[in-house]
């Protein structure tokens, strides 16, 4: 054993101590070395002192400069004393050793080295162990063998380039801490502390040395070791011990120990020479031999011999120096170990979480030999763009799942591409674009492996046997492998859908095979690991060996050659890692094989792709080469037809504001991007969480007060006499002078606030305070870019606001040129106004070029708190009478309470009197019940407001401050049927309440508005299932103690509406209810056509929007435009008096403008012009013309609104996006009185909100008043979650319609639109905390319909019973026969699954038993869709797939094709084994039973799924009718 630290065991002897000097080398003695500059091209040799060793190389040193400039400097005595902070420098090692001697030395000198580096003769730093290969030298601070080195650094002597290193050694085995020694001819040196720049080089070797020490201590009996340990036990023990060392950085792995097994073995057998005779010999120790052999086997695996010819390497006919094979291999091995160690340390520093941020890309070069020779894809002549089938509102988290058969993948050059080049993780920043083609059909839940013959799958019913639609895909973003049993299924994702891959094309099959082979191999390895007692029992190397032993007949066989097996597994490693990461068993995911594979992949230095935090759906144009290579698509591409005004607005914007270049983008864009990704139509689980934590209060109306920078100015005076006085007696003036500026009423002035920002104010009136201060009362003006318009606004546009500011005249900095514009309105003035605008823009551009001040335009009042732009109130601006219209309409604090008397009070601007009926929040009476969280039962447990009768007002005692929370009222509680039971609620009128003797005291802050309780004969009735009045009736008495329900006693008198003062109860929740609200709704449908708005419905579909608007009695659809024939046919059936044009709206607009002689104002394609010219004379006669259309409504297709569309060439998806241009062009050309745009909720955030902002900007440019908002259909009386964005526009002089009030409880958060400065606007508050009426349930909606079977196809049926619920009575009306109660037919397997889904709320695929079933074909298949369990974590547990509806819940978002494996998934009837029928879907949307649909069952479902719910349209129509009636009155 090693006893003396100065006598280490030398186990690292170099094979050759010194290389002989060549005859042609220059020799330089010491004296010449120091004389001057040396030739850098010559080798430098030192001469040994008194021995026969060959001369060794000395390192090069910097040449000394001999051309110094001299300057005489006089130093003071003090300055001439120099304090030496550095160490002594010595040229010769011998001198340095002598200077550091502490006393007499009998043995060979031993010293310590700190701040050392090892380098070659050229001064380049070199790894420690490379000294075995070449001559290395040392530069260090040589210290005596002292204990406290840092304290006595001054004792050290610095020596540069000494040595060479003759050998090295390791000691410290007994102590447990490795000590590394190096020896030169002069002395032995203990390596204590490397220099900072050398630490990374030295640490690798030191860790190897520490491994040697730890292995020794685990095996040597003399220090308590056990030589009989097994290899796995030894590895685990060593790794655990080293990782536990205090101060050890990084994480040591078993692989690191194994990879250095031979090194450890060679060091320890060197100790056998000094070992006791009783000790075990390390050279023959089985565990040490196993460690060495494990290392050797790894070396052999890594030797993939390249085809290199024999002989030495020649470059330009010059032969390189021969290097022995042993040295060459050793050098390669050391370099490889160095790289592996660095990778291990990096992983240790990053920790496990950092791996989530990168994706190791598979190298195409490394997998090339596993694939066929290059080939190219030829597109089918029938291929269609997948964007055509894009769901309206699908985003990443809920895109539909489809099947792709007969598929192939290729790049932009149409070259066939391996699937594994695409990242397998969502969000990886990919650097390769891969497209695909194939035959697409909807997923029917059938089980079939990728590349499996279709005949083996569980086929669906006959209507799914077709091959599908031939499509070409947009770029593939990610892919996954799912496996179960013997099945392996590959699924790819584009921005439009997930596609389960079935059989590839014959040409592409060889390109698919390596991926499937690797997937099968991965499954075999997982099976192998599961068979072990511990998954980590088998290391990476062990698994490689076992895979090499697979039978050749195995589907996972790769090769019998271990080296080839490892290469295959590593180069295809991402496929295997993905399957491991998705495996539910954590021990498999964290197995030694998986971590070893990841390390091996990292060692190959592959490209690492950055992982993004969020997956961004970027659906721009489809760049698939098949779009241009194949013949024309079956659906012709046509650019939008536009008017010149719309074309200018949009093209100017995209010319100046490309998304990637926009520097002045809206400050909310970043947030809007996040919103766009988070907004999903099917948000059940997420929204429930939001409802709990979200406050339903909006940003309060802004009342900014700016601190202005005042300046003393003597040149301020009034002109003329006072023209009146303010209400407080202050003198009013018409004109003033500030310096040379003349300030008049109605002018705009600029101020400067304390931040130096210019503020523009419109002068309302000027007055002089009683203290003499000359003041201005003004209204702030905002630049368009500061409004919701953002960068879509014109730089010259200003908007008047309701924010007022009072300031002194002396604060005015300058006058601004602002024109309060008011142009004549109507289609007759279009061209006149357009010409005036052209002249104005040219003038502004000329002023800009000349550097003159900008002249601003102000056309509208911006009111963000109402989400609207209004016409300027010209008749109320700048009157100078001391009154401001903005200040007058400001409402006081909405929570303010004012006690008027013992019998009345005002709260939230509503007056309450004793005997009034009012709403109380339900949470006052009972704690909110726990609501179920299963998909579809979202409204279960939500309560409507409690109807109460105000009996008394209790004023606070004494001088106590009046506060809504402390002021109490006494009320009588009325109960509802749903307070008794859901069964009672189902059979009762939704407006019925029960009288009780329950009298309670309630805080005023629990009040939510007023209502009326009447006799049943006094309440209004309607055939429409929509509540618009706050009316209830009472006929029964309820005793909550006994549960008894009795007829209302005669002595109980309910106030009828006649006993109320007219209009006294017209307010509810702060909003004035118009008299029209109280009229019988039947009268709405009887309004004559002449008194309705003549309406044009564009993108009409089957007519849901028109139906609701006509039911409201406000519109009559005279014209409708629809592209799809079945939808157009359905519209005609239900609106026979309308002229329905089933054609492209671009062609129709062109035909109309040609008819009216305005072809010069029309921008269209030649194709549109050709088709318009082919219109029959009858069609042309029926076309509307400007002046006839009073109302335009519609919902332009929204599939293309996502992505970056930039007015460049693109296919169908771009055309759909441009439909908004055609829609706006209809409005611009016809100039109707009212305009309504409907779209998906995400319309406001698509494209970073650009499309939404440009739409609003276009309407404002036309001169319209505009209001924007988002509404939830479920709050207006349908049993379905459906969020829609709306934009109202009203002509100048018209009343801009307000938003309808949500009337039903529904679990939906406040639907916000983000505004600048962190504010937001919500058109309606959330009703999750209460509403006037309960939610409509699935039972309310379809509980009366007769039972039908799977695949029911009979179009007409008898009802078989009377309607039960209030909703059923309204929706059925006078319909006698039930039509379209037909159901899609499921395949055999899905029908079995449906039958096995329990008939209780919330049940879905999770409730299926884990077993196999035999189909009629004899095939045995899994009852649980095998692909779901392994991917549930990634897809929110696939919640709702194969789900049953809840009788007491609601329908999920209406989809165009209900499928058990579809985007929504919950489509099974609550207690029947089938998919919901067409009529049930129609009722969920609020279509009356007499409404007809057209085409096959798929077309009917599509018409319903794309429609606006008629009850929501009805509620909007009621508000439009109020606006129309207000003008008439």
From Swiss-Prot:
<feature type="domain" description="BAH 2">
    <location>
        <begin position="910"/>
        <end position="1049"/>
    </location>
</feature>
<dbReference type="GO" id="GO:0071514">
    <property type="term" value="P:genomic imprinting"/>
</dbReference>
<dbReference type="InterPro" id="IPR029063">
    <property type="entry name" value="SAM-dependent_MTases_sf"/>
</dbReference>
<dbReference type="InterPro" id="IPR018117">
    <property type="entry name" value="C5_DNA_meth_AS"/>
</dbReference>
<keyword id="KW-0489">Methyltransferase</keyword>
<dbReference type="InterPro" id="IPR022702">
    <property type="entry name" value="Cytosine_MeTrfase1_RFD"/>
</dbReference>
<dbReference type="InterPro" id="IPR001025">
    <property type="entry name" value="BAH_dom"/>
</dbReference>
<keyword id="KW-0808">Transferase</keyword>
<dbReference type="GO" id="GO:0006346">
    <property type="term" value="P:DNA methylation-dependent constitutive heterochromatin formation"/>
</dbReference>
<feature type="active site">
    <location>
        <position position="1198"/>
    </location>
</feature>
<dbReference type="Pfam" id="PF01426">
    <property type="entry name" value="BAH"/>
</dbReference>
<keyword id="KW-0238">DNA-binding</keyword>
<dbReference type="GO" id="GO:0003886">
    <property type="term" value="F:DNA (cytosine-5-)-methyltransferase activity"/>
</dbReference>
<dbReference type="Pfam" id="PF12047">
    <property type="entry name" value="DNMT1-RFD"/>
</dbReference>
<dbReference type="GO" id="GO:0003682">
    <property type="term" value="F:chromatin binding"/>
</dbReference>
<feature type="domain" description="BAH 1">
    <location>
        <begin position="741"/>
        <end position="873"/>
    </location>
</feature>
<comment type="similarity">
    <text>Belongs to the class I-like SAM-binding methyltransferase superfamily. C5-methyltransferase family.</text>
</comment>
<dbReference type="InterPro" id="IPR031303">
    <property type="entry name" value="C5_meth_CS"/>
</dbReference>
<feature type="compositionally biased region" description="Basic and acidic residues">
    <location>
        <begin position="21"/>
        <end position="35"/>
    </location>
</feature>
<keyword id="KW-0949">S-adenosyl-L-methionine</keyword>
<dbReference type="GO" id="GO:0003677">
    <property type="term" value="F:DNA binding"/>
</dbReference>
<dbReference type="GO" id="GO:0005634">
    <property type="term" value="C:nucleus"/>
</dbReference>
<feature type="region of interest" description="Disordered">
    <location>
        <begin position="1"/>
        <end position="56"/>
    </location>
</feature>
<dbReference type="InterPro" id="IPR043151">
    <property type="entry name" value="BAH_sf"/>
</dbReference>
<protein>
    <recommendedName>
        <fullName>DNA (cytosine-5)-methyltransferase 1B</fullName>
        <ecNumber>2.1.1.37</ecNumber>
    </recommendedName>
</protein>
<comment type="function">
    <text>Major CG methylase that methylates chromatin CpG residues and maintains DNA methylation. Plays a major role in genomic imprinting, regulation of embryogenesis and seed viability. Maintains DNA methylation at the FIE1 gene locus in the embryo.</text>
</comment>
<feature type="region of interest" description="Disordered">
    <location>
        <begin position="674"/>
        <end position="706"/>
    </location>
</feature>
<keyword id="KW-0539">Nucleus</keyword>
<dbReference type="InterPro" id="IPR017198">
    <property type="entry name" value="DNMT1-like"/>
</dbReference>
<dbReference type="InterPro" id="IPR001525">
    <property type="entry name" value="C5_MeTfrase"/>
</dbReference>
<dbReference type="GO" id="GO:0044027">
    <property type="term" value="P:negative regulation of gene expression via chromosomal CpG island methylation"/>
</dbReference>
<dbReference type="InterPro" id="IPR050390">
    <property type="entry name" value="C5-Methyltransferase"/>
</dbReference>
<dbReference type="GO" id="GO:0009793">
    <property type="term" value="P:embryo development ending in seed dormancy"/>
</dbReference>
<feature type="domain" description="SAM-dependent MTase C5-type">
    <location>
        <begin position="1093"/>
        <end position="1527"/>
    </location>
</feature>
<feature type="compositionally biased region" description="Acidic residues">
    <location>
        <begin position="674"/>
        <end position="694"/>
    </location>
</feature>
<dbReference type="GO" id="GO:0032259">
    <property type="term" value="P:methylation"/>
</dbReference>
<keyword id="KW-0677">Repeat</keyword>
<feature type="compositionally biased region" description="Polar residues">
    <location>
        <begin position="697"/>
        <end position="706"/>
    </location>
</feature>
<dbReference type="Pfam" id="PF00145">
    <property type="entry name" value="DNA_methylase"/>
</dbReference>
């Amino acid at each position: 054993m090693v006893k003396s630290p100065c006598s280490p065991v030398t186990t690292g002897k170099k094979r050759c101590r010194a290389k002989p000097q060549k005859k042609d080398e220059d020799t330089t003695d010491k004296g010449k070395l120091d004389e001057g500059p040396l030739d850098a091209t010559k080798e430098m040799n030192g001469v040994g002192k008194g021995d026969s060793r060959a001369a060794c190389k000395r390192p090069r040193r910097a040449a000394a400069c001999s051309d110094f400039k001299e300057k005489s400097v006089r130093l003071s005595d003090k300055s001439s004393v120099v304090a030496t902070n550095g160490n002594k420098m010595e040229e010769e090692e011998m001198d340095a050793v002598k200077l550091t001697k502490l006393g007499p030395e009998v043995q060979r000198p031993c010293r310590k080295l700190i701040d050392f580096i090892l380098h070659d003769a050229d001064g380049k730093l070199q790894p420690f162990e490379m000294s075995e290969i070449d001559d290395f030298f040392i530069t260090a601070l040589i210290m005596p063998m002292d204990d406290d080195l840092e304290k006595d650094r001054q004792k050290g002597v610095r020596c540069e380039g000494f040595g060479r290193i003759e050998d090295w050694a390791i000691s410290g085995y007994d102590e447990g801490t490795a000590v590394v020694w190096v020896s030169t001819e002069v002395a032995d040196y203990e390596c204590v502390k490397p220099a900072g720049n050398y630490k990374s080089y030295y640490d690798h070797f030191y860790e190897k040395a520490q491994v040697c020490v730890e292995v020794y201590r685990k095996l040597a009996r003399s220090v308590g070791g056990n030589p009989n340990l097994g290899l796995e036990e030894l590895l685990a023990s060593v790794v655990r011990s080293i990782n536990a060392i205090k101060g050890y950085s990084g994480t040591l792995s078993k692989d690191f120990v194994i990879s250095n097994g031979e090194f450890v073995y060679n060091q320890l057998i060197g100790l056998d020479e000094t070992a006791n005779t009783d000790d075990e010999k390390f050279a023959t120790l089985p565990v040490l031999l196993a460690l060495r052999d494990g290392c050797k086997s790894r070396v052999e695996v890594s030797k993939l011999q390249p085809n290199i010819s024999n002989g030495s390497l020649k470059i330009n006919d010059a032969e390189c120096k021969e290097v022995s094979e042993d040295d060459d291999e050793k050098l390669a091995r050391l370099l490889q170990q160095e790289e592996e160690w660095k990778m291990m340390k990096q992983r240790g520093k990053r920790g496990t979480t950092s791996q989530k941020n990168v994706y190791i890309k598979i190298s195409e070069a490394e997998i090339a030999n596993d694939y066929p020779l290059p080939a190219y894809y030829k597109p089918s002549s029938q291929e269609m763009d997948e964007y055509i089938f894009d769901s309206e509102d699908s985003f990443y988290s809920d895109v539909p799942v489809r099947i792709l058969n007969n598929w192939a993948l290729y790049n932009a050059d149409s070259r066939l591409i391996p699937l594994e080049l695409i990242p397998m993780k969502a969000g990886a920043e990919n650097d390769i674009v891969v497209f695909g083609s194939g035959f697409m059909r909807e997923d029917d839940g059938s089980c079939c492996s990728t590349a499996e013959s279709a005949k083996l799958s569980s086929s669906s019913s006959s209507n799914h046997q077709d091959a599908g639609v031939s499509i070409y895909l947009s770029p593939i973003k990610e892919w996954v492998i799912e496996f179960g049993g013997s099945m392996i299924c590959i699924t790819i994702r584009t921005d439009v859908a997930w596609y389960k891959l079935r059989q590839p094309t014959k040409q592409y099959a060889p390109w698919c095979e390596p991926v499937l082979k690797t997937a099968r191999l991965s499954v075999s390895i997982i099976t192998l690991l599961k068979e072990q007692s511990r998954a980590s029992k088998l290391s990476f190397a062990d698994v490689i060996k076992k895979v090499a032993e697979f039978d050749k007949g195995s589907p996972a066989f790769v090769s019998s050659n271990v080296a080839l097996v490892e290469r295959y597994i590593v180069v295809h490693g991402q496929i295997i890692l993905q399957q491991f990461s998705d495996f539910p068993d954590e021990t498999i995911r964290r197995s030694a094989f998986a971590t070893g594979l990841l390390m091996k992949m990292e060692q190959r230095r592959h490209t690492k792709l950055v992982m993004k935090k969020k997956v961004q759906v970027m659906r721009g144009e489809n760049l698939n080469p098949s779009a241009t290579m194949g013949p024309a698509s079956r659906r012709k591409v046509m650019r939008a037809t536009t008017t010149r005004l719309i074309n200018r607005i949009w093209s100017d914007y995209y010319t100046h504001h490309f998304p990637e270049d926009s520097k002045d983008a809206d400050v909310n864009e970043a947030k809007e991007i996040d919103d766009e990704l988070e907004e999903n139509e099917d948000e059940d689980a997420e929204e429930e969480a939001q409802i709990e934590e979200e406050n339903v209060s909006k940003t309060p109306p802004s009342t900014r007060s700016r601190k202005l920078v005042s300046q003393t100015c003597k040149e301020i005076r009034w002109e003329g006499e006072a023209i009146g006085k303010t209400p407080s007696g202050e003198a009013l003036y018409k004109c003033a002078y500030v310096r040379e500026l003349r300030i008049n009423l109605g002018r705009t002035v600029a101020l400067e606030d304390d931040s130096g920002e210019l503020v523009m104010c419109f002068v309302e009136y000027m007055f002089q305070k009683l203290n003499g201060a000359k003041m201005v009362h003004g209204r702030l003006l905002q630049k368009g870019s500061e409004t919701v318009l953002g960068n879509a606004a014109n730089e010259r546009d200003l908007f008047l606001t309701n924010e007022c500011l009072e300031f002194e005249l002396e604060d005015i900095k300058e006058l601004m040129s602002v024109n309060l514009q008011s142009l004549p309105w109507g289609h007759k003035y279009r061209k006149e106004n357009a010409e005036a605008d052209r002249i104005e823009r040219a003038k502004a551009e000329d002023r800009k070029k000349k550097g003159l001040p900008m002249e601003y335009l102000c056309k509208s009042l911006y009111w963000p708190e109402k989400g609207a732009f209004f016409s300027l109130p010209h008749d109320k601006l700048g009157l100078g009478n001391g009154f401001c219209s903005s200040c007058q309409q400001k409402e006081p604090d909405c929570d303010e309470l004012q006690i008027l008397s013992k019998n009345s009070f005002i709260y939230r601007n509503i007056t309450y009197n004793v005997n009034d009926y009012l709403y109380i929040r339900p949470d006052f009476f009972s704690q909110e019940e726990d609501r179920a969280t299963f998909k579809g039962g979202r409204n279960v447990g939500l309560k409507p407001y409690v109807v109460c009768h105000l009996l008394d007002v209790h004023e606070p005692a004494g001088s106590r401050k009046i506060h809504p929370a402390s002021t109490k009222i006494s009320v009588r509680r009325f109960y509802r049927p749903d307070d008794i039971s859901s069964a009672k609620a189902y059979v009762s009128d939704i407006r019925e309440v029960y009288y009780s003797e329950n009298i309670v005291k309630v805080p005023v802050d629990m009040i939510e508005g007023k209502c009326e309780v009447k006799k049943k004969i006094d309440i209004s009735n309607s055939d429409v299932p929509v509540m618009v009045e706050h009316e209830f009736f009472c006929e029964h008495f309820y005793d909550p103690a006994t549960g008894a329900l009795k007829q209302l006693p005669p002595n109980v008198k309910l106030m009828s509406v006649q006993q109320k003062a007219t209009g006294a109860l017209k307010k509810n929740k702060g909003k004035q209810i118009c008299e029209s609200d109280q009229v019988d709704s039947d009268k709405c449908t009887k309004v004559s056509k002449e008194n309705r708005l003549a309406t044009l419905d564009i993108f009409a579909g089957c007519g849901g929007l028109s139906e609701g608007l006509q039911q409201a009695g406000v519109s009559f659809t005279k014209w409708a435009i629809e592209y799809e024939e079945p939808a157009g046919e359905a519209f005609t059936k239900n609106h026979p008096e309308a002229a329905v044009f089933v054609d492209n709206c671009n062609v129709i607009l062109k035909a109309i403008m040609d008819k009216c002689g305005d072809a010069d104002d029309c921008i269209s394609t030649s194709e549109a012009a050709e088709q318009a010219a082919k219109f029959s004379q009858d069609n042309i006669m029926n076309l509307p013309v400007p002046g006839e259309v009073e109302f335009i409504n519609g919902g332009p297709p929204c599939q293309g609104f996502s992505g970056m569309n930039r007015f460049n060439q693109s296919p169908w998806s771009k055309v759909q996006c441009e439909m908004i241009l055609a829609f706006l062009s209809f409005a611009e050309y016809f100039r109707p009185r009212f305009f309504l745009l409907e779209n998906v909720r995400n319309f406001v955030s698509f494209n970073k909100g650009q499309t939404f902002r440009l739409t609003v900007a276009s309407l404002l440019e036309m001169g319209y008043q505009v209001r924007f908002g988002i509404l939830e259909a479920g709050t207006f009386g349908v049993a379905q979650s459906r969020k829609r964005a709306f934009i109202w526009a009203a002509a100048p002089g018209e009343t801009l319609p307000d938003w309808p009030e949500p009337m039903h409880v529904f679990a939906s958060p406040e639907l916000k639109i983000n505004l600048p400065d962190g504010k937001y606007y919500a058109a309606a508050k959330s009703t999750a905390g209460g509403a006037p009426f309960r939610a409509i349930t699935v039972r309310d909606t379809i509980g009366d319909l007769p039972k039908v079977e799977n695949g029911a196809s009979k179009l007409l049926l008898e009802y078989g019973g009377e309607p039960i619920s209030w909703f059923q009575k309204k929706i059925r009306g006078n319909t006698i026969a039930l039509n379209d109660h037909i159901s899609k037919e499921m395949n055999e397997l899905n029908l079995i699954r449906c039958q096995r889904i329990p008939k209780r709320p919330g049940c879905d695929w999770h409730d299926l038993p884990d077993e196999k079933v035999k189909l009629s074909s004899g095939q045995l298949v899994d009852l649980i869709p095998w692909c779901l369990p392994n991917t549930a974590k990634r897809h929110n547990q696939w919640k709702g797939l194969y789900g049953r509806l809840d009788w007491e819940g609601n329908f999920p978002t209406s989809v165009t094709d209900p499928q058990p494996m579809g985007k929504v998934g919950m489509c099974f009837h609550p207690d029947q084994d089938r998919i919901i029928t067409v009529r049930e879907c129609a009722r969920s949307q609020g279509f009356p039973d007499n409404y007809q649909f057209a085409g096959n069952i798929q077309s009917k479902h599509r018409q319903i799924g794309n429609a606006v719910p008629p009850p929501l349209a009805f509620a909007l129509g009621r508000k439009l009718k109020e606006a129309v009636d207000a003008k008439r009155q």
